[in-house]
Amino acid sequence: MSTGASSMKENLPSKSRAQMSEPAFSNENVRELESLRDRYRKTTNALASAAHDLKTPLSILNGYIELLQSQKLGPLNDRQREVMADMFSSGQRLQHFIQDFLTYTVLETGELRMQFVENDMNVCLSEVCRIWSNRFQERGLALYFLANDKLTPFPFDAPKVQRVISNLLENASKYTPQGGTVWLHAEPHMWERRSVSKSASNGDRRRQSNNAPNAVKVSVSDTGPGIRPEFQLEIFDDFFRLPGNEATDGMGLGLAIARRLLMGMGGKIWVESELEAGSKFSFLIPLNPILNSPPRGTSQ
């Protein structure tokens, strides 16, 4: 009987024989893929653990630098103040680098959790500006923010919104030349995609689009060199660096992290830019958050 079975198999069309062997091949691929994923997870977790271990000593170091800068331990001459300022700036960059990496690893594992609590967007943004004001002054840049009294408190994750703004301000401060200006602005916004049903007629759509705002739009504008049109989507990809800017500080994660955080809040981000005319990064956050929005993914 075995001879007959063997003969039957040999007489099968080549396509049928390939189909019989396909499951074994697919299973092998699945095992290899799982092995690669497991190795990736272990490597990512190890790097995240190392980065996390650096946070505490770096925070202590930055704290002592701030204490010395305050001159509470004794006066500093001009040269010493200059050195301390450079040390503090370097420490802040390293701290931002570590935080970017830690946030990225959490986003990759899908473990990020949003905490929607009623907050005041004006207060949220003014706190970020206060934190960044010294950095902008050191770089010879002007940073402007004017509170908008049309904004009312609504539920959003303030620390993560501040993280998004910080990444956008960091990006603006890197590429805006000395003497340039950066504006931070927020306003109520009617996000039509979120409120107009697909089944509505054209007339209904027009009437619905006149409803009250259902989102907040936040924008960061700069007087930098601008971004070429072909890169205005790609800049939100993981580890992307604009050609010619590979030597700039950072891992190319700031905008990618901002995009993922906003996706987790049910929001979106985009850029409007012209060469030699600056860039304007804007994002939307819904007034009624979508609690089950996943923080992972590559499409909006």
Identify the residue ranges that each predicted region occupies.
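Short helix-loop "hinge" at the ATP-lid/N-box region of the Bergerat-fold HATPase_c
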Residues: 172-173
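Conserved catalytic submotifs in the C-terminal HATPase_c
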Residues: 81, 115-120, 137, 142-152, ...
